[in-house]
């Protein structure tokens, strides 16, 4: 059981059945009374038992609509455990028991009358006993209402009904004596036929008798309506409540497209105790119907839901929710309710909206018709309209309300022209200077709108609504809108599934029923009016407590949504009618809420709610934030403008004794010895000791430093270089200034961040405290700089080519897919810059390179990252042999720049890194030769596929049956050679079939002029003698494109632009590709994630 459901639960009792039983008994009498008032047959059938019950048990007149209505209300109240119903029933039972006692005391001549009185008395005493024992089961209260107004209405209605009934009796008296006619009318209309008919001389016609009871029932109904309406109005939103809701919407309104409808003034509201969330609701037929998601901070939704459920229990209401989002429905489910998908909300994203395409043909044609008819669209905020124009808007909305062409929606604000709604958007269609249609949309956060009202003139041209929606999407960028909600269409999935080909009989029947009821209610209209815009459908849910209450919740929803309008119902209150502020007293006490319902001071409310957040923060953070506030109150700017220091820490340490310096950095450690304080200060260049002595400080004391500065703070200090009393070279501080307050504590000053995942996620903290992390950043920068210097020294040009590409090519890898809204075009993040660099080669750039980012949607491990730095370089009139020396030189120079020597750092068995010399030439082997060494059997380019498969089987290496010989050799190479390689080795002459962009070997058939550089099981780079034959290039890429079309996600697509460029002839060229991240990894001896400043991390 959830905490909320535990809060709602009451102790079980042996008398829990009493309210339901009492309700059922009274309800049966009410039903029989109503049927007897309508049907003479029923009246005749139950005459004998009715008369006995009426005489000894319970008032049960032969015909009385008024009494049937009273009993129906009482039965419903008893079943809902209303305390006032308990009092009424107990009082009636005591009065009835007294009547029987009085009868027995008088004595009766007929024995069966005495028996009846005894039985009736026993029943009354038993009923009173059970009701008294079950008193605590009737806990539900009744909302406050205008009792005096209701009582006056009852008296006046009864008086009018009695007079009219008296008049009817004078006109149609039947056998009723003249002297009894007024009293008879009074008895039937106002006294619920409490006096027996035998007490009067004669009786009127049965039809007149029924009319008299109906007059009483109408009087009671009018009174009930007045009372219920006063209850709703009296408990509806106050100005302060609406102001609080608007404040929550300003902070959290972006979460819910229907959130603004919570400001409707015919709803009531209940807040979480903190005031950070609220639920608006309305009570219909005993159901407390919450409208959509709670408003406010999602973290406070459980508290708001708990307060709402407690309210439902206190008043005996059945809880229900209408139109909750998936997040809201989940929150209600966690509170113990059940969820049922009600429909789908139609969301338009203007950046994706296009009138082109076959799916939008109907909308496009409608828009064209409206434009041809001369319709134009103007869009304004409500606050931009003068008072006279807004009055005209309201008048048009009322005039067009009942037209056959009206397209209303179920979720509506129900008011126009209120100053508090100035941010609402008005879209008008104008024809010949006359407004012919309009839309009103309410805010959805800061960049969205939700449809509230849709009206059109009967004379508006066809397609006007489509024109307004389309123009709103087209002009959305100018008015700052990125989301448009058309509200939700109920039972959308039923309409869609029932219309599909092959739909089952149940789905078709369900759709037929919905279409049938759409004649009266806008069910299909809502669906079709949204569907044609091709929106995103977002599900909305209804929530309920018990499956048995689903019908009641459904009826309440139908009434609340306006599909069923009750007599004399008042909807969409314009003014604030509530008299009881529901907002928490702490929130009201801030003075930020406005009694007119306008939004509170946003920054003030945000600051107030932020104060409530403080207990959620760790204690050290709260202490530091309190210190920050104290400093700001003293006028200290904890984040001042820059004042460049005169020295770095390294320069200060190298300065002469007594030199004046000003440095800035982060405080890492601090030791206070009273009048003298020592602190460690670090900047990027190094770390030094600060000595703060009260005798040396120009202003303030060490105590001021201790009160103000925490570990991790950024400070600026001035002073002279010298030695401490212990002889340590230090900065003797004469003045200091805080330049950045650190609000979160640093990790352990000796160990730092020990968790690798934490080091990745908080790299900034790792850099602040870990010198190794800083050294890796420096080494990576040195590697990149050395690579550039080496290539530029050889007259290579550095260029930049597109990262967003329409065709993924240049390597066999799975790409990342993205989309450009401006052109409605799918694009790829490049997997390699090769094809664009070769275009430059065709254009005459003979030596070119690019050092940039590439992206491959593949695995993540110690040597792979989806986003990586890639070097590609091309040299005309060269081949892959040239790049053997060129690649080795690049890596050796990079190692020299990072480590000070041509070495790789490799871990020993104990994990300690040691240098491994990589100077001089590196080993070169052929692929087939290396595989032959590993297998112990000779293979070559001419080895047949069957033999290669047999060798794989012997070595336990898996392969796919559709692979050719080249692919099998590559698999043998990767398992037996690449993974086992230690010192840097070049493996050359790969099979042609696995090298689609490489020229065939000049003398050896079946292999291509390509090499891979491998070191310690990691592929560092590859080089080709590039394939320059455009005809052969096209054939190979067509083979690749067939693989891609067949479902291979790594196969390259056919790039016609590249092939056309190649047909202009590219000179013989050697190309190099090198993974820079892997080079840095081997040079530093760390994993890729450690060498990258910000590697990709999985979501928390």
Curated annotation (Swiss-Prot):
Query: Which catalytic reaction applies to this protein?
Result: tRNA(Lys) + L-lysine + ATP = L-lysyl-tRNA(Lys) + AMP + diphosphate; L-lysyl-tRNA(Lys) + a 1,2-diacyl-sn-glycero-3-phospho-(1'-sn-glycerol) = a 1,2-diacyl-sn-glycero-3-phospho-1'-(3'-O-L-lysyl)-sn-glycerol + tRNA(Lys)
CDD domains from the UniProt entry: LysRS_N (cd04322)
Record's Pfam families? LPG_synthase_C, tRNA-synt_2, tRNA-synt_2_TM, tRNA_anti-codon
Q: Write out the GO biological process terms.
A: lipid metabolic process; lysyl-tRNA aminoacylation; response to antibiotic
* Function per UniProt: Catalyzes the production of L-lysyl-tRNA(Lys)transfer and the transfer of a lysyl group from L-lysyl-tRNA(Lys) to membrane-bound phosphatidylglycerol (PG), which produces lysylphosphatidylglycerol (LPG), one of the components of the bacterial membrane with a positive net charge. LPG synthesis contributes to the resistance to cationic antimicrobial peptides (CAMPs) and likely protects M.tuberculosis against the CAMPs produced by competiting microorganisms (bacteriocins).
Instruction: Quote the protein name from its UniProt record.
Output: Lysylphosphatidylglycerol biosynthesis bifunctional protein LysX
Span list, region Lysine--tRNA ligase: 602-1100
Q: What is its EC number?
A: 6.1.1.6, 2.3.2.3
Task: Tell me the classification of the organism that encodes this protein.
Answer: Bacteria, Bacillati, Actinomycetota, Actinomycetes, Mycobacteriales
DNA-binding region(s), chain positions: 661-739
Per the record, the similarity remark reads: In the N-terminal section; belongs to the LPG synthetase family.
Question: Where are the residues of the annotated region Phosphatidylglycerol lysyltransferase?
Answer: 1-601
Q: Where in the cell is it found?
A: Cell membrane
* PROSITE patterns reported in the protein's UniProt record: AA_TRNA_LIGASE_II (PS50862)
> Could you give the cofactor binding note from the entry?
Binds 3 Mg(2+) ions per subunit.
Membrane protein topology class: Multi-pass membrane protein
Q: What InterPro entries is this protein classified in?
A: Aa-tRNA-synt_II, aa-tRNA-synth_II, aa-tRNA-synth_II/BPL/LPL, LPG_synthase_C, Lys-tRNA-ligase_II, Lys-tRNA-ligase_II_N, Lys-tRNA-synth_II_C, NA-bd_OB-fold
């Amino acid at each position: 059981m959830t905490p909320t459901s535990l809060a709602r639960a009451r102790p079980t009792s042996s008398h829990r059945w009493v309210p339901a039983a009492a309700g059922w008994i009274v309800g049966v009498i009410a039903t029989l009374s109503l049927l007897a008032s309508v049907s003479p047959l029923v009246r005749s059938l139950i005459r004998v038992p009715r008369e006995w019950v009426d005489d000894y048990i319970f008032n049960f007149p032969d015909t009385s609509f008024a009494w049937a209505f009273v009993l129906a209300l009482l039965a419903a109240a008893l079943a809902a455990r209303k305390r006032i119903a308990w009092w009424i029933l107990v009082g009636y039972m005591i009065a009835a028991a007294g009547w029987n006692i009085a009868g027995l005391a008088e004595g009766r001549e007929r024995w069966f009358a005495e028996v009846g009185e005894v039985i009736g008395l026993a029943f009354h005493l038993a009923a009173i006993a059970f009701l008294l024992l079950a008193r605590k089961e009737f806990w539900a209260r009744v909302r406050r209402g205008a009792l005096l107004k209701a009582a006056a209405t009852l008296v006046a209605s009864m008086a009018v009904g009695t007079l009219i009934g008296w008049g009817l009796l004078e006109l149609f008296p039947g056998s009723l004596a003249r002297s009894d006619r007024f009293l008879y009318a009074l008895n039937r209309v106002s006294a619920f036929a409490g006096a027996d008919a035998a007490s009067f001389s004669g009786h009127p016609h049965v039809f007149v008798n029924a009319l008299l009871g109906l007059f009483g029932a109408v009087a009671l109904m009018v009174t009930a309506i007045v009372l219920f309406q006063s209850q709703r109005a009296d408990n509806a939103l106050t100005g302060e409540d609406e102001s609080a809701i608007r404040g929550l919407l300003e902070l959290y309104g972006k979460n819910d497209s229907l959130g603004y409808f919570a400001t409707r003034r015919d709803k009531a509201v209940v807040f979480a105790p903190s005031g950070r969330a609220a639920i608006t609701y309305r009570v219909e037929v005993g159901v407390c119907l919450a409208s959509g998601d709670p408003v406010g901070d999602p973290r406070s939704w459980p508290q708001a839901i708990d307060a709402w459920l407690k309210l439902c229990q206190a008043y005996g209401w059945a809880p229900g929710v209408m139109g909750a989002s998936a997040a809201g429905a989940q929150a209600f489910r966690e509170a113990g309710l059940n969820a049922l998908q009600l429909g789908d909300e139609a969301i338009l994203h203007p950046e994706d909206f296009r009138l082109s395409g076959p799916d939008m043909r109907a909308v496009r044609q409608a828009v064209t018709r409206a434009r041809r008819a001369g319709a134009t669209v103007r869009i304004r905020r409500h606050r931009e309209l003068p008072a006279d124009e807004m009055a005209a808007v309201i008048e048009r909305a009322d005039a067009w309300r009942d037209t056959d062409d009206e397209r209303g929606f179920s979720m509506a604000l129900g008011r126009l022209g209120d100053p508090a709604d100035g941010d609402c958007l008005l879209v008008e269609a104008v024809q010949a200077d006359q407004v012919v249609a309009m839309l009103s949309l309410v805010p959805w956060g800061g960049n969205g709108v939700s449809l509230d009202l849709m009206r059109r003139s009967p004379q508006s041209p066809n397609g006007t609504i489509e024109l307004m929606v389309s123009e709103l999407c087209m002009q959305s960028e100018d008015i700052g809108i990125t989301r448009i909600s058309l509200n939700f269409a109920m039972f959308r999935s039923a309409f869609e599934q029932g219309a599909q080909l092959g739909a089952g009989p149940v789905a078709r029947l369900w759709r037929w029923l919905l279409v049938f009821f759409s004649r009266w209610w806008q069910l299909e209209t809502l669906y079709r009016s949204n569907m044609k815009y091709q929106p995103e459908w977002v599900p909305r849910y209804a929530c309920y407590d018990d499956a048995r209450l689903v019908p009641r919740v459904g009826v309440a929803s139908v009434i609340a949504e306006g599909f069923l309008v009750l007599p004399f119902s008042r909807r969409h209150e314009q003014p604030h009618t509530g008299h009881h502020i529901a907002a928490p007293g702490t929130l009201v006490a801030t003075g930020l809420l406005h009694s007119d319902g306008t939004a509170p001071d946003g920054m003030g409310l945000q600051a107030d709610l932020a104060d409530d957040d403080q207990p959620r923060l760790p204690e050290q953070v709260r202490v530091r934030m309190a210190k920050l506030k104290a400093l700001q109150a003293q006028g200290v700017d904890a984040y001042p403008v820059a004042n460049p220091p005169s020295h770095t820490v390294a320069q200060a340490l190298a300065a002469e004794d007594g030199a004046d310096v000003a440095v800035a950095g982060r405080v890492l450690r601090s030791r206070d010895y009273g009048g003298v304080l020592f602190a460690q200060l670090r900047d990027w260049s190094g770390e030094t000791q600060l000595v703060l002595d009260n005798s040396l400080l120009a202003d303030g004391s060490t105590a001021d430093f201790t009160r103000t500065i925490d570990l991790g703070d950024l400070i600026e200090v001035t002073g002279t270089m010298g030695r401490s009393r212990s002889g340590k070279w230090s900065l003797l501080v004469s003045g200091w200034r805080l330049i950045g307050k650190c609000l979160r504590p640093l990790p352990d000053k000796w160990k730092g961040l020990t968790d690798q995942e934490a080091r990745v996620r908080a790299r900034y903290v790792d850099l602040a405290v870990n010198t190794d992390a800083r050294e890796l950043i420096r080494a990576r920068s040195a590697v990149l700089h050395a690579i550039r210097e080496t290539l530029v020294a050889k007259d290579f040009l550095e260029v930049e080519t597109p990262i967003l590409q329409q065709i993924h090519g240049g390597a066999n890898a799975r790409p990342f897919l993205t989309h450009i809204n401006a052109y409605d075009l799918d694009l790829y993040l490049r997997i390699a810059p090769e094809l664009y660099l070769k275009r430059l080669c065709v254009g005459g750039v003979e030596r070119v390179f690019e050092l940039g980012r590439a992206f491959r949607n593949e695995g993540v491990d110690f040597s792979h990252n989806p986003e990586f730095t890639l070097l590609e370089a091309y040299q005309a009139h060269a081949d892959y042999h040239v790049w053997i020396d060129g690649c080795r030189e690049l890596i050796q120079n990079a190692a020299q720049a990072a480590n000070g020597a041509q070495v790789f750092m490799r871990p020993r068995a104990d994990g300690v890194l040691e240098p491994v010399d990589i100077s001089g030439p590196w080993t070169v082997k052929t692929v087939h030769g290396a595989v032959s060494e590993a297998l112990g059997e000779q293979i070559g380019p001419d080895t047949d596929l069957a033999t290669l498969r047999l060798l794989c089987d012997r070595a336990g290496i898996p392969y796919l049956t559709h692979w050719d010989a080249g692919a099998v050799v590559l698999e043998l190479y990767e398992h037996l050679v690449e993974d086992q390689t230690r010192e840097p080795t070049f493996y050359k002459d790969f099979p042609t079939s696995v090298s689609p962009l490489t020229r065939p070997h000049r003398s050896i058939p079946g292999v291509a002029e390509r090499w891979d550089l491998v070191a310690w099981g990691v592929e560092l780079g590859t080089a080709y003698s590039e394939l320059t034959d455009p005809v052969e290039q096209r054939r190979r890429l067509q083979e690749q494109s067939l693989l891609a079309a067949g479902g291979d996600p790594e196969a390259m697509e056919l790039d016609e632009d590249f092939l056309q460029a190649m047909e202009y002839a590219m000179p013989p060229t050697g190309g190099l590709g090198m993974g820079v991240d892997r080079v840095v990894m081997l040079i530093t001896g760390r994993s890729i994630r450690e060498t990258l400043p910000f590697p990709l991390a999985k979501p928390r």
